[in-house]
From Swiss-Prot:
It catalyses: 2 D-alanine + ATP = D-alanyl-D-alanine + ADP + phosphate + H(+). Keywords: ATP-binding, Cell shape, Cell wall biogenesis/degradation, Cytoplasm, Ligase, Magnesium, Manganese, Metal-binding, Nucleotide-binding, Peptidoglycan synthesis. It comes from Leptospira biflexa serovar Patoc (strain Patoc 1 / ATCC 23582 / Paris). This is D-alanine--D-alanine ligase. Pathway: Cell wall biogenesis; peptidoglycan biosynthesis. It is found in: Cytoplasm.
Length: 349
């Protein structure tokens, strides 16, 4: 049986570039090689595509390497002399693209739309679901409308609202949590106990972003739970996994807590009781379906007084060997090689 040729897109132009490189190392090593020929395509922070020219591409171990060191080793191993134009991947015979990207243009619908234009199927959600999930403000409006608990929130838009006036006259009380509306992986996020602290955070975010989400801080147990879809004939059967409780050693599960070894404790399955687990599974499945996600997703919650409040849904969650979805799949006896096969089969269907 001939193998299906796929591209594994990784790296990218977002602040989560290095996380994508780590995730994709695991993806590359895990995809079923009896079914698929995998070609890793590196996208550098400037958006240049580095496409291997050898018949059996190699993905170097990124551990302990700088971006430059990794790229040099990647290019040497794969006989790459210079970057290609992005559209060149349409001439390489790829039948699908596995998205190992995270955040920014890799997760907000832009790369999805680009691949759609080239006629290359891809894993994960489409343009609309990706952009809606990345837009935390509009996603919250949808979640709230569908009866999923959401902490009080509002949005500040640069040049459109007076942030200082708004922060001094909030309809809900401090402390609040502040993050870029279109951000990911807890980059540039923080807690503010006063309007002045909030303004400092907003000013920092406005340097690089135009929209800021301000949300009432809900204290409680932080959990995250994934959804997978299993292809059955022509249908996709979505089902929830088990929740993971996250206990950061810092005040919040920020970027460092997520991706620094030992910076947080993750317990899978989360010890939150059967009733709360069932509610989390119901809510995460509903979030997945409300946004129109495809293949997989992961939704984060805070449990306060027994009530799970949704924080956000991620359409391209982390996929290192120790990331949350692999943990949750393992707890249910699901092999990640099978998961990646499901994602590719769905993309090709």
């Amino acid at each position: 049986m001939s193998k299906i040729k796929i591209a594994l897109l990784f790296g990218g132009i977002s602040g989560e570039h290095i996380i994508s490189v780590r995730s994709s190392a695991f993806i590359f090593a895990t995809i079923d090689r009896e079914k698929y020929d995998v070609c890793p395509v590196y996208i550098n922070p400037n958006g240049k595509f580095w496409i291997p020219t050898v018949s059996e591409p190699i993905y170097p171990d990124p551990s302990g390497k700088t971006e430059i060191e990794f790229l040099q080793e990647f290019n040497k191993a794969n006989a790459i002399v210079s970057p290609s134009e992005p559209a060149d991947i349409s001439q390489m015979g790829f039948l699908s693209a596995f998205l190992g990207l995270h955040g920014g243009a890799g997760e907000d619908g832009r790369i999805q739309g680009f691949l759609d234009t080239l006629g290359i199927p891809h894993t994960g959600s489409g343009v609309l679901a990706s952009s809606l999930a990345m837009d935390k403000y509009r996603a919250n409006i949808l979640f709230e409308a569908m009866g999923i608990p959401v902490a009080p929130f509002l949005e500040l838009e640069k040049g459109k609202t007076d942030p200082r006036k708004t922060l001094l006259n909030l309809s809900f009380s401090y402390p609040v949590f502040i993050k870029p509306t279109l951000g990911g992986s807890s980059v540039n996020t923080g807690m503010a106990k006063t309007a002045e602290e909030a303004m400092t955070l907003v000013d920092k975010i406005f340097v690089t972003d135009d929209r800021v989400l301000v949300q009432k801080l809900v204290s409680g147990t932080e959990v995250s739970i994934g959804v997978l879809e299993k292809p059955e004939g022509k249908k996709r059967n979505p089902f929830p996994l088990v929740p993971t409780e996250i206990r950061p050693k810092s005040e919040f599960f920020d970027f460092e807590a997520k991706y620094t070894k030992g910076a947080s404790e993750e317990i899978t399955p989360a010890p939150v009781g059967d009733e709360v687990t069932k509610t989390l599974q119901e809510y995460t499945l509903r979030c997945h379906e409300i946004l129109g996600c495809k293949g997989y997703s992961r939704t984060d919650f805070i449990i306060s007084d027994g009530v799970p409040y949704v924080l956000e849904t991620n359409t391209l969650p982390g996929m290192t060997g120790t990331s949350l979805i692999p943990q949750q799949a393992k707890a249910l006896g699901i092999n990640m090689k099978d998961v990646f096969t499901w994602l590719l089969e769905i993309s090709l269907s």
